[in-house]
């Protein structure tokens, strides 16, 4: 749910048979309100408050433990009555590589259990009555490579066999989580989900099937991949500033889309009605927050922008509105849904008060 908190989008995803991964009590409440069933809700949180664990258990969400110490914490919350199915999050440490390219550094990540910890966690949970187990891991974000999932799958499939052999645990599912990204830059080659699926299938047949584990379900968290390309932030040019650089000030800001400000993330920008015009002007595109990082683009080549032009900031369907905030007292914008028949529906009103 973290990639998009819009209830109507969640209903659309439900129509295609998707479950939901939740990271907070609020997200759990949304999933429950939208009638997601217990087997369709995963609760993957960290540094989790007691009341959130209690609520997750109450609605039948599958709890994905981030740390081995949470077992005792959960034991007290649930009065020793553990659910029959639970999952544990794995962190292999070190660097995660695809070929010779370092994709991320799990050893610096706050998430998950070490190799020895997850083995011990399965043993403890089994002794407390847990009957069915899942494994979860997230090792890299927004990869634009068809090799990420198959590489991660091999790590987790081999771990699953080891856990089964060393603990006797019944492994019901392996969650490859997120990480399959989108091509934010026009020159990038998009991921091919069919190729990715075949790669995972190949590793499954090489590792799990020969081990007698050919019935293990595979879960994924493809929120960004499914939603990012299908949303955009539309903003109006309202100021032009000429100092040491050329600035275009717009009526949106990082409170509407914070990825460029906090990650330095690239989002493609087009100017409505000037899609075919030459990109021969260099601009920084800025919002009005009292932060110099409030920039949607830096030194971006764009067509000449006139006041009143609408700028289309692309690929904001995931981690756009849902990451918004209210710094400087900024209010949330409206959200519109473009339907298949061309109709436009307002799915969230603009905020009118703080």
Model-derived features with residue positions:
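Charged (often Lys/Glu-rich) extended helix/loop segments that serve as interaction or gating elements
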Residues: 208, 213-354
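Glycine-enriched alpha-helix->loop->beta-strand junction motifs that scaffold or abut catalytic
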Residues: 15-19, 35-40, 54-63, 79-85, ...
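Short active-site loop/helix that positions an aromatic residue
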Residues: 28-34, 72-77
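Conserved, mostly hydrophobic/aromatic
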Residues: 24, 56, 88, 135, ...
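Active-site loop/helix belt of alpha/beta enzymes
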Residues: 92-239, 302
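Single conserved hydrophobic/aromatic residue that forms the stacking wall/gate
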Residues: 1-7, 11-12
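Catalytic beta/alpha-barrel core
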Residues: 17-26, 40-48, 61-69
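Hydrophobic, small-residue-rich alpha-helical packing segments that form membrane-like cores
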Residues: 58, 64-66, 70-107
